[in-house]
Amino acid sequence: MTGGKSGGKASGSKSSAQSRSSKAGLAFPVGRVHRLLRKGNYAQRVGAGAPVYLAAVLEYLAAEILELAGNAARDNKKTRIIPRHLQLAIRNDEELNKLLGHVTIAQGGVLPNIHQNLLPKKTAKPGKGPSQEL
């Protein structure tokens, strides 16, 4: 057996450490997700691809919600996303509302909704009706 601490790599190659998140092109931490999967007692063993996939799904969901919340903030002429914008974004999107239907968002408020029976009756305008001339 030759070598020492080279770990099977050629002794001349110097490679900087690269995180699994950067290898996968993700912003969410793959290492942390892997640790949480192991410590959470979800299964005895966790595959190498599972935390990468889960981190990618979480990043996609976060990006989707933040995009819709940013649109809601812009509609309200605000530059900062607040919980109300998150609530409006989630409840107005059919799939996100189904996914997060039982989730309560603190300081989110409610969706504006007025029942049709409570709205004022629409009446015909006096100038638009049939003429009363003979």
From Swiss-Prot:
SMART domains: H2A. GO terms for cellular component: nucleosome; nucleus. Belongs to the histone H2A family. The nucleosome is a histone octamer containing two molecules each of H2A, H2B, H3 and H4 assembled in one H3-H4 heterotetramer and two H2A-H2B heterodimers. The octamer wraps approximately 147 bp of DNA. Residues 11-25 have a biased composition (Low complexity). It comes from Phaeosphaeria nodorum (strain SN15 / ATCC MYA-4574 / FGSC 10173) (Glume blotch fungus). One of its GO terms (molecular function) is protein heterodimerization activity. In contrast to vertebrates and insects, its C-terminus is not monoubiquitinated. PROSITE patterns: HISTONE_H2A. The record marks 121 as: Not ubiquitinated. The modification N5-methylglutamine is found at residue 107. One of its GO terms (biological process) is DNA repair. Coiled coil: none annotated. InterPro entries: Histone-fold, Histone_H2A, Histone_H2A/H2B/H3, Histone_H2A_C, Histone_H2A_CS. Phosphorylated to form H2AS128ph (gamma-H2A) in response to DNA double-strand breaks (DSBs) generated by exogenous genotoxic agents and by stalled replication forks. Phosphorylation is dependent on the DNA damage checkpoint kinases MEC1/ATR and TEL1/ATM, spreads on either side of a detected DSB site and may mark the surrounding chromatin for recruitment of proteins required for DNA damage signaling and repair. Gamma-H2A is removed from the DNA prior to the strand invasion-primer extension step of the repair process and subsequently dephosphorylated. Acetylated by ESA1 to form H2AK4ac and H2AK7ac. Its main location: nucleus. Pfam families: Histone, Histone_H2A_C. Keywords: Acetylation, Chromosome, DNA damage, DNA repair, DNA-binding, Methylation, Nucleosome core, Nucleus, Phosphoprotein. The modification Phosphoserine is found at residue 131. PANTHER family: HISTONE H2A (PTHR23430). The [ST]-Q motif constitutes a recognition sequence for kinases from the PI3/PI4-kinase family. This is Histone H2A. It is found in: Nucleus; Chromosome.
